[in-house]
Design a protein with these regions (language model features):
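Classical protein tyrosine phosphatase
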Residues: 93-109
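Short sequence/structural elements of tandem HEAT/ARM alpha-solenoid repeats
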Residues: 55, 101, 154-155
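A short, hydrophobic/aromatic-rich structural module that often spans a beta strand
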Residues: 84-98, 159-168
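Extended, hydrophobic/aromatic-rich amphipathic alpha-helical segments that build helical scaffolds
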Residues: 82-89, 103-106, 131-134
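Fungal transcription factor middle regulatory core
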Residues: 16-19, 47, 62-67, 110-182
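C-terminal transcriptional activation/regulatory domains of eukaryotic transcription factors
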Residues: 1-78, 83-95, 122-124
């Protein structure tokens, strides 16, 4: 799996999200990422159970896109994460054309944030680097599979490859299991 999300950051944001009053939860960049994660998870759950449920994740996919478009004025890594996760989700549904388009948007959003540039010494250098290389690889693989242009010129980026780090599952195990009607 692509390390699009930092497990620790995502879990902390998720726990904060669950602690908020439901009435105070309008559109937010994190919410678009969360719905994208739910879309992927819903699809995996229905496949794992061997059921043909009507909820295969498309509703969450649409909610993620809706929240994403409502938050376009708030540019941040959540925009890149949402688009990249939705791209992998579309690919898992064998909708490679949609996946390629979403991956291309994720690359452009990452470039807009400067993730393609080497920022050594930055506090979140590793997570920025991981996210860039995830969207770069996702876009390149899809472009190659479909015979379409990747849209990334090698001279346009100098982001170094991130270090290999094993993430601790302990924080993920602490997260409450309540997707519910958020």
């Amino acid at each position: 799996m692509f390390p699009i999300l930092d497990a620790r950051d995502f879990t902390l944001q998720y726990m904060e999200y669950l602690g908020r009053n439901v009435m105070d939860q309008g559109p937010s960049p994190f919410k678009s990422v969360l719905y994208a994660v739910y879309a992927c998870a819903a699809n995996m759950l229905s496949v794992a159970r061997g059921t043909h449920v009507s909820h295969d994740g498309t509703e969450y996919f649409e909610l993620a896109l809706f929240n994403h478009y409502q938050n376009l004025r708030h540019c941040g890594v959540e925009e890149v994460q949402c688009l990249a996760i939705l791209s992998t989700c579309a690919a898992s549904w064998n909708n490679l054309s949609e996946s390629w388009k979403l991956a291309g948007q994720a690359v452009r959003a990452a470039q807009d944030l400067g993730l393609h540039i080497n920022f050594e010494g930055c506090e979140n250098d590793q997570s920025r680097s991981r996210l860039w290389w995830c969207v770069f690889t996702l876009n390149s693989c899809l472009s190659s599979c479909l015979g379409r242009p990747a849209g990334i010129v090698e001279t346009d980026y100098n982001c170094r490859v991130p270090d290999v780090v094993e993430e601790s599952p302990s924080l993920l195990q602490q997260a409450p299991n309540r997707p519910g009607n958020r």
